Design a protein with these regions (language model features):
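N-terminal catalytic or cofactor-binding beta/alpha core of small enzyme domains
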Residues: 1-90, 101-106
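Loop/turn elements at helix/coil->beta-strand transitions in domains of secreted/extracellular proteins
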Residues: 54-58, 88-93, 122-123, 161, ...
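Mid-sequence, gly/pro-rich, charge-dense loop/helix-turn segments that line enzyme active sites
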Residues: 41, 123, 133-135
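Active-site-adjacent mobile loop/cap segments within catalytic or ligand-binding domains
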Residues: 163-176
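Active-site-adjacent substrate-binding region
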Residues: 140-166
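Short secondary-structure boundary motifs at beta->alpha junctions and helix caps
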Residues: 128-141, 149
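Active-site microenvironments of hydrolase-like enzyme catalytic domains
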Residues: 12, 80-81, 87-131
């Protein structure tokens, strides 16, 4: 039922973008952020939504830019999440899709890619948080971790090499 979506795709860092060149290196002059929906995380979200809808899921794709100023982006996206959950209480899966950014100590940037069906694809990493350190009042972290490991397993079985190791950390982000 399209009127009762169960999945929300959103982007706390909406303007994160990809280098549109097929190279194995990162060019420092490349702008890592874009307000163009065809070049930033909205485009990635559109592809995910299309696949989920083709599989029969009802999905909301929030394309709002929360990182016009980087600081405070998580608070702004959290407000939106709460509004969506109030409007659509049947939501079961909320995915905050980001571009991965790997930087070494010497500031070298790495592009994690895999070859899937003969084409280069950006690898995916799932982040799952938990209580600990300064993170408290996170009662569903075990459920989130189980979901994350199952999603990781399905993706890796379907597309070997696509998934980076799951990142499990004492952080909550907007995972509640």
């Amino acid at each position: 039922d399209k009127t009762k979506p169960t999945i929300l795709i959103y982007h706390t860092h909406t303007t994160e973008s990809y280098q549109m060149l097929d190279t194995d290196w990162f060019t420092k002059s490349y702008q890592t952020r874009s307000n163009l929906a065809t070049r930033n995380m909205v485009r990635v979200g559109d592809e995910i939504v299309a696949q989920l809808e083709a599989a029969g899921f009802a999905v909301i794709h929030d394309t709002k830019i929360y990182d016009a100023t980087y600081n405070g982006a998580y608070y702004r996206s959290e407000d939106a999440i709460e509004a969506y959950q109030k409007k659509y209480p049947q939501l079961q899966v909320l995915l905050d899709i980001h571009r991965d950014a790997i930087q070494t100590n010497d500031t070298t940037r790495i592009k994690p890619v895999a070859t899937i069906n003969g084409k280069k694809a950006a690898q995916i990493m799932i982040i799952s948080g938990c209580e600990g350190g300064g993170v408290t009042d996170f009662p569903d972290w075990r459920y989130n971790l189980r979901f994350a490991t199952q999603l990781q397993k399905i993706c890796e079985e379907s597309y070997p090499g696509l998934m980076r190791p799951l990142y499990f950390c004492n952080r909550q982000y907007n995972m509640h």
